């Protein structure tokens, strides 16, 4: 296993097709799949009304995780970002977010943007077992 430096973590995170968002909802932890885009040293995703939006608005501490693998090299990676989520509500912030190359897998309407400002980012690369 190799511990990744911050620059490599951001590079890998920018290639992830889907990430996972972990939030506290009441007394429970919830994990949601999200499509993300790296914007500078932040992560942006879009969402519709519902539990995910309510959770990041009330309890802004979140964890974003993404991973991937390379069949050619037999290696996999995982990046974890711990940070604070901000729902974008200023018109110029929303306008900038709408210009980002954020592609959603879902056809569900997603009219809100959220930016995660990291407190920490860590990553690992490791060999995938043959079994």
Model feature map: region roles:
Residues 113-130:
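Charged phosphate-binding loop/patch that engages nucleotide di/tri-phosphates or the phosphate backbone
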Residues 16-48:
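Short beta-strand segments
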Residues 14-16, 28-29, 78, 107-109:
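Short solvent-exposed loop/turn micro-motifs enriched in small/polar/acidic residues
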Residues 45-46, 64, 123:
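Short hydrophobic/aromatic-rich beta-strand segments that constitute the beta-sheet cores
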Residues 27, 51-53, 130:
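Short, surface-exposed beta-strand-loop junctions and turns on beta-sheet-rich folds
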Residues 49-112, 118:
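Short, structured beta-strand-loop surface elements
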Residues 1-20:
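Short, basic/aromatic recognition patches
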